[in-house]
């Protein structure tokens, strides 16, 4: 196998119920050769098959289930072996979700958690989260699926791994509301609750930062201009260094109280500022939650 025949490999793991099945289906749609529930001890043998495939397996997605500590011993050794093979471009995609979301999903599907087959789902979730702490730390892409519908998870994966963008350094800029929690997949979090809040202007209350009247209001203040100047300078300085260190994506989260007005406005602004230089994806996690600030 030569470097001209590089193989792209994505190892998909994470919390049970966080969306591994949807993720594998998404990779299959992207033309990846997919294998689910591959025992880690078989990974070295699978790598040999990839090397002998003569280019027929140049994009591979593996769903790996880690429910016993003995599995990790095999996995760490296999990952170390991967790092020595220059013809494989590996990614570890870790799917996560809030405990409350996972419990709800188990109740909706009436399934038992694999680590608590006769007990409460939350006990199994807690045990699995402890087991996967090191795995999550080793992953180079972490996706929080708590607020994602299956279609939205597919869109995220396509954005991250489609042929046009998978080699690029990606910047995800998202708005959120602190009242709904900080995004667990955020690398950088900025709090803009110090800015004037259009929520308290009655006719702007039902609007969002996507509406011109709201964005114009937020952007007209001197403190907003000063903050954006400092923020863009900081981000512009940091991004090349993150890229140099081998990070494949950066998630920047901007939060206000409810994720409706201020954070949405500034997220849109930052996304437009970065798009000329980077592959940028802008999203608004809580913009549909019209429950007030």
Swiss-Prot record:
UniProt-recorded name of the protein: Nucleotide-binding protein BC_5156
Has UniProt tagged this entry with the keyword Nucleus? no
Record the organism.
Answer: Bacillus cereus (strain ATCC 14579 / DSM 31 / CCUG 7414 / JCM 2152 / NBRC 15305 / NCIMB 9373 / NCTC 2599 / NRRL B-3711)
Q: Which GO terms describe its molecular function?
A: ATP binding; GTP binding; molecular adaptor activity
Q: Which residues form the signal peptide?
A: none
Q: Could you tell me the superkingdom of the organism this chain comes from?
A: Bacteria
Q: Which residues bind ATP?
A: 14-21
Biological classification of the source: Bacteria, Bacillati, Bacillota, Bacilli, Bacillales
Q: Which NCBIfam families match?
A: PRK05416.1 (NF003828)
